[in-house]
Amino acid sequence: MLLAIDSGNTNTVFAVYDGDAKRGEWRAATNANRTADEMGVWLLQLMTLEGLSQGDIDATIIASVVPATVFNLRMLCHRYFHSPPMVVGEPDVDLGIGILLERPDEVGADRLVNAVAAHETYRGPLIVIDFGTATTFDVVDEEGNYCGGAIAPGVNLSLEALHMASAQLPRVAIGRPRTVIGKATIPAMKSGIYLGYVGLIEGLVKRISEEFGAPMRVIATGGLAPLFAEATDAIQTIDDDLTLRGLLIIHRRNQPD
């Protein structure tokens, strides 16, 4: 079985795949100071609850946008699963797609993994929107090449910034407002963030499609994707497992024939 690890800025997701079937998925706050032993004990306990054991894992793959986490994640794979991990972004890992950028080394591993999964699943041309710590828009052409995109502040990051930088604005949770015109502070904040991001999504999708010069299918992933997809026709598909499935695809592509 394959242990796939997606280490993001906010959370790190661990998933076990048996072929195409996902046998378990667990999430922890990303912390570069968390040791391999701490992660190993935690993960093995959760695997046991799903009927999985340490010996079931025979391969591992890591994608991380936080370089400081990679060492301990490597140690986790070596020490607890006796598996040298495949690490997305390293020269010996073939993604199977072109990266049409001036500085390919600057692209986050998660964005490339999403591009791989999106092209394999839906073909192109595509826009992939990932609602994470940042909200990213990534363009994949019909041949599967990663063409770049746009990066905006994440929804929760924007809400937190409003609270931290403004003396009278409270910390609020994102939600769909009942009205555009808020009659109190919290409804006004929810309207501004939620509907503002709907406008951001629609505006960027329109501009990207116009610049690309062809109709594009829009795939959304990340925890907030359903909340925003219900408010706009700009998003055609929600794919919760896009990043993890991308890791599965990349691992298979790098196996000996």
Swiss-Prot record:
Main location group: cytoplasm
Active-site residues, as the UniProt record annotates them: D110
Cofactor notes: A monovalent cation. Ammonium or potassium.
CDD domains, per the entry: ASKHA_NBD_PanK-III
GO molecular function ontology, one term from the record: metal ion binding
Residues that, per the record, bind ATP: D6, S7, G8, N9, T10, N11, T12, V13, T133
EC numbers, comma separated: 2.7.1.33
One Pfam family in the UniProt entry: Pan_kinase
Enzyme class per UniProt: transferase
Catalyzed reactions: (R)-pantothenate + ATP = (R)-4'-phosphopantothenate + ADP + H(+)
Gene Ontology process terms (BP): coenzyme A biosynthetic process
InterPro entries the record matches: ATPase_NBD (IPR043129), Type_III_PanK (IPR004619)
Keyword Cell membrane set for record: no
Cofactor(s) needed by this chain: NH4(+); K(+)
Localization, UniProt: Cytoplasm
One Gene Ontology term, aspect cellular component: cytoplasm
Alphabetic keyword roster: ATP-binding, Coenzyme A biosynthesis, Cytoplasm, Kinase, Metal-binding, Nucleotide-binding, Potassium, Transferase
Residues annotated as binding K(+): D130
Chain residues that bind substrate: G108, A109, D110, R111, T185
Entry similarity comment: Belongs to the type III pantothenate kinase family.
Chain's role: Catalyzes the phosphorylation of pantothenate (Pan), the first step in CoA biosynthesis.
Subunit structure: Homodimer.
Cited NCBIfam families: baf (TIGR00671), PRK13318.1-2 (NF009844), PRK13318.1-6 (NF009848), PRK13321.1 (NF009855)
HAMAP family recorded: Pantothen_kinase_3
Protein name: Type III pantothenate kinase
